[in-house]
């Protein structure tokens, strides 16, 4: 099982971001031009995962980066596990979940893809 983890989400541009540098009511960097910058941001994704997967509640922290791409986001999850695990074993479990209990929710591929290849992906 997972002892603790850090979720780093990489988000595509959203409609709430600025097209050019300007003032922001929240944080100074939220006013920076979205298409020219990688913008660190906060995220509630880690807490949301804990609500959907109760076993992970309180075990994940999160951070986000807004990047200049029009669509598709990704999550990098780094975990400390209760027991040692090999990379190939982790991939096998994730692939099995994508074909079983998380089918239609979690996608898995080892193809050499880039973000726009997922534009019509429903996961």
UniProtKB/Swiss-Prot annotation:
Residues in the signal sequence: none
Modification Phosphothreonine, positions: 9, 14, 16, 43, 61, 69
Family: Belongs to the glyceraldehyde-3-phosphate dehydrogenase family.
Motif placement: [IL]-x-C-x-x-[DE] motif: 77-82
Pfam families membership: Gp_dh_C
Pathway info: Carbohydrate degradation; glycolysis; pyruvate from D-glyceraldehyde 3-phosphate: step 1/5
Cross-link Glycyl lysine isopeptide (Lys-Gly) (interchain with G-Cter in SUMO2), sequence positions: 18
Site residues by UniProt (Activates thiol group during catalysis): 11
The reaction(s) this protein catalyses: D-glyceraldehyde 3-phosphate + phosphate + NAD(+) = (2R)-3-phospho-glyceroyl phosphate + NADH + H(+); S-nitroso-L-cysteinyl-[GAPDH] + L-cysteinyl-[protein] = L-cysteinyl-[GAPDH] + S-nitroso-L-cysteinyl-[protein]
Positions that bind D-glyceraldehyde 3-phosphate: 14, 43-44, 66
Location of N6-malonyllysine modifications: 26, 47
One GO BP annotation of this record: positive regulation of canonical NF-kappaB signal transduction
Residues with PTM S-(2-succinyl)cysteine: 79
Role noted for this protein: Has both glyceraldehyde-3-phosphate dehydrogenase and nitrosylase activities, thereby playing a role in glycolysis and nuclear functions, respectively. Glyceraldehyde-3-phosphate dehydrogenase is a key enzyme in glycolysis that catalyzes the first step of the pathway by converting D-glyceraldehyde 3-phosphate (G3P) into 3-phospho-D-glyceroyl phosphate. Modulates the organization and assembly of the cytoskeleton. Facilitates the CHP1-dependent microtubule and membrane associations through its ability to stimulate the binding of CHP1 to microtubules.
Gene: GAPDH
Source organism: Cavia porcellus (Guinea pig)
EC number: 1.2.1.12, 2.6.99.-
CDD domains: GAPDH_I_C
Transmembrane segments: none
UniProt name for this protein: Glyceraldehyde-3-phosphate dehydrogenase
Subunit composition and interactions: Homotetramer. Interacts with TPPP; the interaction is direct. Interacts (when S-nitrosylated) with SIAH1; leading to nuclear translocation. Interacts with RILPL1/GOSPEL, leading to prevent the interaction between GAPDH and SIAH1 and prevent nuclear translocation. Interacts with CHP1; the interaction increases the binding of CHP1 with microtubules. Associates with microtubules. Interacts with EIF1AD, USP25, PRKCI and WARS1. Interacts with phosphorylated RPL13A; inhibited by oxidatively-modified low-densitity lipoprotein (LDL(ox)). Component of the GAIT complex.
